[in-house]
């Protein structure tokens, strides 16, 4: 037993230690994983160890020298995965995915430049293999020893156990890590590069399977639905924004109850209140709801730019990032010659934006790397809203007009922290820190927005621009109902929670008078609304929403979980309420038909995403977006 440990097991232990060391060092030196806090650092140290024990432990099932050779082969394959990601990250500032490998638009674009991003110190990543080969040559006695399969199985099971311990603490630090899949960086940071590769492979296989069995016949029911639900444009508004810039402003986690709300007698959002009452000739939709699922912000982006719902689980931005889309920026480009851009104070890989934006057809993506991310400018998820808006002005000025620009704010994001010097409003006093802090960050966002309007005017961009402002999703979850009862002065029942899913939608169209519009609608309706304002008929495109200004608008608002709201009925968990009074009602033929329609709408939208059906939807005057035509940031710098 002593010799067994000395030779065979010591070779395994040496392989594990060397492999762990090079992987951990690569995490620290090659990748920008954004590790924060002790827990994340411990997990970063731990995750290469669990991977090494499991994968290298598989070789222990073989006998003698063959075991060591298999261990070397496994080590080499894992090193290949590591080094391929290192090179890819140096070029694209992102991790490899299986779709990347198949796409010439990403890996192929590296071309001869791959040699320019190799470095002399890269030999370090193969040093452990050289050491292990030397040990194998100089210690031939390895071939004499056999290990019991029971012991080898115990090692492998230990690797699996270590992974689940890793996963437990990762999920504790970042809930819904795998179901929502925020960012490839997060998966690598928490679970490791090798587990990320497996995860990506499984996700890709699932997507490819669904896609492989789809055909153009599957699109027929979708086309029938969208054709029958088409709402023709309102002549008063159709084409009223033609040729004008569109500036779409995303208010992070902003709910409509903040509009006109006073905290201790003081308005929380005085500028937005002014806009909501027709200031700057803004039209305010006060019965507008978010329709996001687990994908939250990414679902809102997807829905508003494509008029399709996010998925029932996870984020379509991540899992369906390679799909074909008939998006608003692509249509505006091909029909009216618009330049499109996203401006955001977070890094581009979050929510897989750097990949899916290429499939949506955004010409430019200004992420955190293009802004001043010094400590005084950053809080919570990224860049503070005031410097974000100020620094965005020259970026907007650089765009060829007309442009469609999407600006995504961040400061009003959970946990709603704010530096004391930036706070102009005292916190609420419910005792729930999340709710109490929410009002401070909402006020800061309101001030930043007012500043942005002034800066747009000073830059000469205001007069010729449609400005759309929207809240992406709720900021306060049901976990805070006690505090919200105190804030709103009413019990937060299931009915009231559904009403609380209202988020603001404000649209300023130059030359059109503003005011309050009581139409019921949701994020699914934004794309056809903007198309009609631009004078582009939405009828031939696959839209699950309808124009908010149309007299034929469908005012049934479907939530991602199958609940719904109309001006007359609210349905939560199949219980029907009167929308105006909250009184419980008995289900009737009308509510049953509404439920059937909502389920059909969600199901058909899911089918479009799961089966990538828009690749079959051919239009004479619309060309499918080619992602290889788009390049963002760092990947263009290497020649």
From Swiss-Prot:
Residues 25-41, 89-116, 172-639 are extracellular. Could not restore staphylococcal growth after ltaS depletion. The chain crosses the membrane at residues 4-24, 42-62, 68-88, 117-137, 151-171. GO terms for molecular function: metal ion binding; transferase activity. Induction: Transcribed under partial control of SigM ECF sigma factor. It is a multi-pass membrane protein. Belongs to the LTA synthase family. SUPFAM superfamilies: Alkaline phosphatase-like. The gene is ltaS1. Its EC number is 2.7.8.-. Pathway: Cell wall biogenesis; lipoteichoic acid biosynthesis. The active site is at residue 297. It is found in: Cell membrane. Pfam families: Sulfatase. This is Lipoteichoic acid synthase 1. Catalyzes the polymerization of lipoteichoic acid (LTA) polyglycerol phosphate, a reaction that presumably uses phosphatidylglycerol (PG) as substrate. GO terms for biological process: cell wall organization; lipoteichoic acid biosynthetic process. Residues 1-3, 63-67, 138-150 are cytoplasmic. CDD domains: LTA_synthase. Substrate binds at residue 413. GO terms for cellular component: extracellular region; membrane; plasma membrane. Proteolytically cleaved by the type I signal peptidases SipT and SipV. Mn(2+) binds at residues 252, 297, 472-473.
